Amino acid sequence: MKNLIRPMEIGDKKQSIDMMREFYLSPALITNGSEEIFNANVDNCIGNSQYVEGYVFCDGDTILGYAMIAKSFSTEFGKHCIWIEDLYIKEQYRKQGIGSSFFKFIEEKYEGCLFRLEVEKGNEKAINTYKKADFTELPYLEMKK
């Protein structure tokens, strides 16, 4: 299987939102999202947003999963920061190296940047995947308003 990582396009909107619904209902997240949020996410990914990018993972015409990144600057580390916001691979395509390929792709595209992501403490499969990609835990409690 030759996987392709490409930017999200308008024709991917329905499938991307379908995957977001599944992802946001999983134990990987503490929020369920909403149709308004899913549409805004995809619209910003396929638009010209300077803050967010969306990607789909494909094998030919078959979409295997998606990812979204957000861009910021880390004053703590003194460099641009790429937040891997969503990384979802359909169940039947997991453990085929798609996540690893995405990490390599994004690290090459944004060489020299800091990469961050969030993971639920009990999501051992994801934690192990991220550790294999050289992510390390930060001892912070995250807060929002």
Feature-to-residue mapping (PLM):
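Conserved beta-strand in the GNAT
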Residues: 54-56, 62-71
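Conserved GNAT acetyl-CoA-binding A-motif
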Residues: 103, 110-120
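Conserved acetyl-CoA-binding loop-helix of GNAT-fold acetyltransferases
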Residues: 89, 95-108, 128, 132
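Conserved beta-strand-loop-alpha-helix junction that forms the acyl-donor binding cleft
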Residues: 116-127, 144-145
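A short beta-loop-alpha structural element at the N-terminal edge
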Residues: 3-18
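A short helix-loop-beta-strand connector motif used in the catalytic cores of GNAT acetyltransferases and
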Residues: 44-56
